[in-house]
């Protein structure tokens, strides 16, 4: 039983190709219904995010190969002009499992260790279950992938440390002021970067967040979303600088929004109580001369990128530990796959001996009492269990490679004449 994965991701195709081949949730459901009902797949799952669209398929027909699935998806999306099979990767059997384990543990992500991908894999599996396209193989594969991701998160540090500017800024603030809930924070700029920083602050229990923005309505909308409802007019926010322990700036501007005289005056009013300024703007929003002021700690994007680089280096150093976990789970998954290959032979073997037992007991059914017949049944069950123990154990033996299984199965089927058993069933 084979399982194939094909797809495009940030490693194999540029964004315009990934966009062209992506599938929404509705489209993914329609696609799954199509390839299952047409017999192309026995089982199937679609994983489609901003950085990847991948198919995981148990073929339903011998002609269904990786190339077949690539061409089918390209045609399904009417993307023949833009997308070529060369934009895709292919994986088969255990390499498919390894790929999904790496995806789920965020080692195949654009940002190493990013935390969203596991939820996206779980959502892809949920859709497959809802569409009844996840059978025994995909179910086991996905649950093993979830187990891998959990072990990676608990046993390694690959998801630790900020790797975005906004999150690095918040982590730095928390290192300096360990309890952010006790600090008053000013956010200058309610754009994407500022919004992310504010939300990260909120996740770290900061609640006293005041927002200022050139467009007041954007400041009010973000304040309402955070539940703070605290805003300041952009034209006059400098009058209140002395109130804040942490100031985050993230605006597009040619001029500094905070200058040394502003902060000098503020520090006089604060009686030199420490202030952290996190400048997330590019070009810089804050006059670098502010660094010279006493108890004023200014960090800009270059400082934060240094933190990010160290965190990424730390995450990369964890990769060997992650691969050990993946290799361990891959062995177990491969052994389980092998048991699927021998299961029909085990069923036939048990059926044959059960049939022999029933025939022999039937000969004595009217010659002995009911109690004696029950004792004979129990005795024959114990004998059969002992007779079948060794051949079944040999079939399930995990030491065998996939290449050895067919010869082992053929040996058992020939010794016990199980082909005749199949013919009798038919």
From Swiss-Prot:
Binding residues for substrate: 49-52, 109, 114-116, 120
Organism encoding this protein: Prosthecochloris aestuarii (strain DSM 271 / SK 413)
Highest taxon, organism lineage: Bacteria
The protein, known as: Glutamyl-tRNA reductase
Matching SUPFAM superfamilies: Glutamyl tRNA-reductase catalytic, N-terminal domain (SSF69742), Glutamyl tRNA-reductase dimerization domain (SSF69075), NAD(P)-binding Rossmann-fold domains (SSF51735)
Described function: Catalyzes the NADPH-dependent reduction of glutamyl-tRNA(Glu) to glutamate 1-semialdehyde (GSA).
The protein's assembly and partners: Homodimer.
Gene Ontology MF annotations: glutamyl-tRNA reductase activity; NADP binding
UniProt pathway annotation: Porphyrin-containing compound metabolism; protoporphyrin-IX biosynthesis; 5-aminolevulinate from L-glutamyl-tRNA(Glu): step 1/2; Porphyrin-containing compound metabolism; chlorophyll biosynthesis
Site feature: Important for activity: 99
Active site, per annotation: 50 (nucleophile)
Something else known: During catalysis, the active site Cys acts as a nucleophile attacking the alpha-carbonyl group of tRNA-bound glutamate with the formation of a thioester intermediate between enzyme and glutamate, and the concomitant release of tRNA(Glu). The thioester intermediate is finally reduced by direct hydride transfer from NADPH, to form the product GSA.
UniProt KW keywords: Chlorophyll biosynthesis, NADP, Oxidoreductase, Porphyrin biosynthesis
The reaction(s) this protein catalyses: (S)-4-amino-5-oxopentanoate + tRNA(Glu) + NADP(+) = L-glutamyl-tRNA(Glu) + NADPH + H(+)
Record note on domains: Possesses an unusual extended V-shaped dimeric structure with each monomer consisting of three distinct domains arranged along a curved 'spinal' alpha-helix. The N-terminal catalytic domain specifically recognizes the glutamate moiety of the substrate. The second domain is the NADPH-binding domain, and the third C-terminal domain is responsible for dimerization.
EC number: 1.2.1.70
Gene3D superfamilies hit by this protein: Glutamyl-tRNA reductase, N-terminal domain (3.30.460.30), NAD(P)-binding Rossmann-like Domain (3.40.50.720)
Positions bound to NADP(+): 189-194
Family as reported in the entry's similarity comment: Belongs to the glutamyl-tRNA reductase family.
One biological process term in Gene Ontology: protoporphyrinogen IX biosynthetic process from glutamate
